[in-house]
Each structure stands twice: as structure tokens, then as C-alpha cells.
Amino acid sequence: MDDFKLKNGSGRLCCGGCGRQNNKLNTYDWLADIPGNAEEQVMVEVQFKNTRKGYYKNSNGLHLEKGDIVAVEASPGHDIGTVTLTGRLVPLQMRKANLKPDAEIRRIYRKVKPVDMEKYEEAKSREHDTMIRSRKIAESLGLQMKIGDVEYQGDGNKAIFYYIADERVDFRQLIKVLAETFRVRIEMKQIGARQEAGRIGGIGPCGRELCCATWMTNFVSVSTSAARFQDISL
């Protein structure tokens, strides 16, 4: 099989400079050497751009390893992501993510082909320009919100717009304009300041990489005294 590299840095051929995203939020598989663990591939964890992850059913019985890039079921079409965990730890991670046993689990279609990567590269090349234009559209509509990132689905049929807003925003007109402008299905997803920092990355006052960009997934409240002690903005 050909090796491919995703622009989110999570593919198996990442350079050293992509180390932050390559290892971001990965679970250490301490069962990897246990006999029979490799054969337990019914459920697979897949990571997409930055911190977004999903769990998928390996219904075709593909032999998958960490770092394999796969095409997975989406609505509509398919998405492209990197396998980050297989084996017996996946059900434990699903419970940690509060996925119920009767939840609808989508499928892994295949390991990516060159044609899949062509669509993926074309879609990802539009993300920055789409973000800049969408910010101007939101401003022209008088919406008090900041669009911090845009993520195109692997086949280019859908785009997720991540935004920050202090108050409730009625973005029905915005969705209509965005759909007409970019000719894709639109999903708006509100995130907090720490989630945005996790997506962008950065260095904390301690001199190390931000916790929310490396390992933290549960953003509990930070007390004023703790923020003052860490010398972070209040």
C-alpha cells in the first residue's frame, strides 16, 4: 500500500516539525503486545484535523495499524482520517467518550487510494481562504462571533466552521450565505477559548506546550486563584 501524509500532521510520514500534532491526544496502547490484541479490530479510533476524533466499525475486516490513513463513512460522502488506536483499548476509550452501546457507529470504507488523497488535498487547500472569507461574511451580517477555523471533510462535500461567541448567535442567514458561496454542506460548531487554543497550539507560562493542545480533553473550570498562580489572563 502507498504511504500518504495528511495536512493535519497525523499521517505516518510526518516530519519532526509536525510532532505536536502527530502525537496529540494519542492513547498509549499498553495492550499492544498482549496476544490476540491485534486481532481485536472490530472498533477503531480515527483522528481528523487537530483534536477531532471518532470511532468507527471495521466491518470489512481490514488489517489496520496506527498511522494508517483511511476513508470513513460520513454524512454525506466520506471523510479521511488517521488510525490512532486499535485493539481492546478502543471500547474503553468509547466509554470514556460517553458513547452508548446502542449509538449509531459509522463504518470504515477502506484504506485510502490516490484518488481519495487527491480530493483530500484539494479540499484542504481551500480551508484558509474559506476561513478568511467567512469572517468577512459574518462581519457583514453584523454577527458578534469569531470564526477561528474551518475544516473541510475529506471529500470536500461538507465544511465545519468552528466559532467563538460570548452570547447566543442566530446564524441561520450566515449558513444560507456560506452554503451559496462555497457550495458545500455547512456545520457550525461553537468552541470555547481553551478549545480554540488547543486547535491552534501554543506555549504556556511554564514554557511547555499547552495542556489543551497535547493531552487534556475535559475542560473543567479554572478558579481565579489557580489562574493567578499560573500567571494566565483572567
Which residues fall in each region the model found?
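Acidic-enriched and Gly/Ser
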Residues: 2-233
